[in-house]
Amino acid sequence: MQLQRELEEYWGMHMLVFATGWMGGFGVIRALVRPWDHVIMDHVSHNCLQEGAIAATRNIKKFEHLNQDEMERMLRETREADPDNAILVVTEGLFSMDADSPDLKFYQKTAKKYNAYLLIDCAHDFGHLGPTGKGTSFPI
């Protein structure tokens, strides 16, 4: 509980603490996504994110790594086909294998455009990247 309170103070928002990073990635997707919802994710997203999506829904699409156009096309097509259910776009702030990052402002703008949610896994950039050390996703 103390760690959770300290993280909430540091970030200025509510936090949920998991025992491992893998459980966090898996658990947050499993908790947010219903069986009829959709997940659109970078095809090299961490295994915990992919497994969380598989556990949550059958409606999963993966776009080519960092391909914004393909991500937007999938988002547009999914929203046109299903105007009612939720769509979660999943990416990482810093991909650990190649040390590359998506254009998070574009992802945020595009998710809003199609009434979708954006989940950014900041496990590999939290604490040492970004203007405040809070990672590449803070603030976007």
Predicted regions and their residues:
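Conserved N-terminal alpha-helix of the aminotransferase class I/II PLP-enzyme fold
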Residues: 1-21
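Conserved PLP-anchoring active-site segment centered on the Schiff-base-forming lysine
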Residues: 28-47
